[in-house]
């Protein structure tokens, strides 16, 4: 995304093509790579996988390269399919699967907020290309409701991560909260996380 912003559109396109080439059959990627080699085969994280949609849509908005969008569509489609396979009946999406593909059994507020934005971008891609993926918006709506109204579905197996600023601001950044709700959320912990003239901790 930085390459796209910086005007290095060919380099950005090649980076996305590299990702597409490494995508696994189920639509996911391993947590990290070094070149063509897998650097971490212990897990595959849902918010990382979903974010391909945000990156592809971002590049298209900058480049207006419809051929790029069409070429990347199968990659995005498979990635979102993998991510939504991890959504529970309550709406949250599991943060990862282990090396054997078993869901880890918990969800992250920040990770799910990122997925919320990625589902919006993925659906924008689908609409632009004339593909029907209305169920992605349904899944996004369920995820948003879980983030806003079901805090018990997150941080079930570890200490709450609400002590970190990203759990506070990311649901606003990703559009889970908007308008007055977003302002109220930011105001509620502003003094806890924001250092005057320095930034957010």
Indicate residue ranges for each PLM-predicted region:
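Acidic side chains
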Residues: 47-48, 65, 94, 98, ...
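A near-ubiquitous, low-amplitude feature marking generic local secondary-structure context
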Residues: 2, 35, 66, 98, ...
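Extended ligand-binding clefts on enzyme/binding-domain cores
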Residues: 71-74, 78-80, 84-95, 102-117, ...
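Acidic/His metal-coordination segments adjacent to aromatic residues that form catalytic metal sites
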Residues: 29-42, 93-107
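Aromatic-rich carbohydrate-recognition surfaces in CAZymes
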Residues: 1-88, 112, 116
